[in-house]
Amino acid sequence: DALRPQRVSGALDYTAWPSVLPTQSESWIGAKRFEIRRDGRELFCKFAVTDIKAETVEDGNVYEMTVKNGYPQWNVASEPKRTPTITATAEDVEQGVKLIWTCEIDVSGLVRQQATVINTGDGLLEVGKVELGFPVPADATEILTTTGHHLRERSPQRQPLTVGRFEKVSMTGRPDFDATLLLSLGETGFGFTRGNVYSAHVACSGNSVLSAERLPYTTGMLGGGEMLFGGEITLAGGEEYTTPWVCGSFGEGLNEVASRFH
């Protein structure tokens, strides 16, 4: 609460501020990032956190590099990989919707998050959008994505982050030549070895979106998620939907950003 901005004259009672999943009940006035309907009617949930758990989870193997005859060799380490993990559970009891948010920090510094939506009420619950985000500081003023076509894929393009929303959508059922692997926000003129950079990636081989957005009262926000068609995800009572992982990286230049993924 100490980080929330003060109330602005002539605006809402609470000044909008980006979170990992901002909703209208938090005074978010940007693009909708959590869209659900019950029996055809859209719900605007006011979630209350019911549980937070921090733990270290054994998650796969750690690989150690050795050099033999001048060539690197990768071997499984004796100790399993341990990943710091935070799991938060929130619920809107009145509207019958539960949300479980999970965030992991890899040993490289890569952050990844996902959310699970659970229908705890009566009637069918249609999930239209769950777009998770990473708030970024004020020095992130320039957007970098890639575009292209056959024989000219992954061509970089830049533009300033202005008030409003920029999004890069992949709607061909898999990442196409036009798809961007990362959406990066950084200091103006950032490069491979200079400038603070913050990047996001949706770990999904289907339809997806990456976005950058800034409101008049806030700093910027990176976001991403799966693009769902109407009726594609409909939950009966007790059923759940889990989003793809949305990965976030940062660094002094793009090389450091990439190193956290690799």
Could you describe each region identified by the protein language model?
Residues 1-214, 229-231:
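Polysaccharide-binding surfaces and accessory modules of carbohydrate-active proteins
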Residues 113, 226, 248-251:
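Functionally constrained cores in energy, signaling, and assembly domains
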Residues 131-132, 217, 260-262:
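Short intrinsically disordered coil segments
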Residues 207, 250-251, 255:
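Short, acidic Gly/Pro/Ser/Thr-rich loop/turn segments
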Residues 216-236:
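Short acidic, Pro/Gly- and aromatic-enriched capping/linker segments at domain boundaries
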Residues 233-251:
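Short Pro-Gly-centered flexible turn/kink motifs
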Residues 242, 256-262:
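An acidic-aromatic substrate-binding cleft motif
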